[in-house]
Amino acid sequence: PLGAPLAQVDAFVAGRARWIEAARVRALARGEEEQRPCSVSREDALALFTQVSDAVFPLFAQVLNGQRPVLKVRQMKTRWGVCVPAKRQITFSLRLAEKPRAAVEYVVLHEYAHFVRADHSPAFWAVVARYMPDYKARRRLLAPSVQGGMESPEGPPPTY
């Protein structure tokens, strides 16, 4: 608090030194991640997202009246994907292409599920779980420390 004795402030900081250092390390890692150039081109990323989308689309074709959404790729700092149902459009983060394929499959299916439910309600998560029961494990693959990389254009078959 303003006007607190310096000894009290020092004791407060000393008592939380481990947490402060851990937070500092996390903040530095985020900064390094944002400044590191992406190892995947936009074209290769779009090809990957299109390939996974082609496998997911049949699950949602009826909701979309058989019309595939427009897929886009852009540099995003805080999201892996964004779905705009009114525009029938999904935008993916370029950095998502650096993650393991199972994580990419999760994000693609997650964004498609927004065509059914445009929120993150229990009903939305039920849609995700219906088609991908292991979605929580896949979502953990999006952590900053997990790197995957691109696989061959054919890649393994979808795991859902």
Please report, for each region that a protein language model flagged, where it lies by residue:
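Walker B catalytic acidic pair
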Residues: E111
